Amino acid sequence: MRELSPRTLARYTQIDYHRELALVATVWEPDPEHPGELREAIIGVARYLLYADGDSAEYALVIADAWQRRGLGMQLMTSLVNAAREQGLKVIEGLVLGNNAPMLALMSKLGFRVDVDAEDPSMRRVWLRLNPDRPEPAPMDLETGS
């Protein structure tokens, strides 16, 4: 994964904790600009952003190619789901490309339901009810949050 621009780094690290949460996985690696020194590199990010209703959120997960299929996505998403539950959220959801079998398998393993997106059949809406004792929510419009 390349180095993040200052603007992108600020976006990942300056968070409004009332509306969003970002979990970042990093490793120390050799710094090519300073031989013999190490630099911290982001290898994965899981985040959620609350919808206007305050009860549900959209998630995103990004793992550097070299770190995929090593359990990092599972660790980050498990922590993100647990944090969303602790925050009192009812539903967390996201969109996944229909041909992204590893991501769909991960979401299924975590208990997410997988539906074909009504607006784009090439996408899958994956969602998890965080309080299983409550009735299932109606499908959410990802653009308006309602």
PLM segments and residue spans:
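Long, contiguous binding/interaction regions
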Residues: 1-146
